[in-house]
Amino acid sequence: AEVKVNEIKYIQKNKVFLLSLKRSKVETEEQDKKITSICKFEFVDRVKSKNIKQNDPEEKLELIGMDYLKNNDNYEINLMFTNNAYITLSTEIIEVTLDDQNKAD
């Protein structure tokens, strides 16, 4: 999925991390169609990133995977991008929703 740096938001006071992405709609027969979706992570206590130029809002990242691991009483959710870039979310509970917005193409 394609993500622009300026479409990644962490709202610390609400403990919400938002990611707007343009992705292939693989869950239907329209796999060649692109759709814009919002990926929302809730109950996020901390966010760390590496190899992402936050001062370049138009930089495009390619999300290639997500995984998580348990670290004591918390979880670390890893969002992995091409070029060895990643974002790590720390949370006590994993709660994620993916909401389709509209067709991109």
What are the language-model segments listed below?
Residues 1-105:
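Surface-exposed, interaction-prone regions used to assemble/regulate multi-protein complexes
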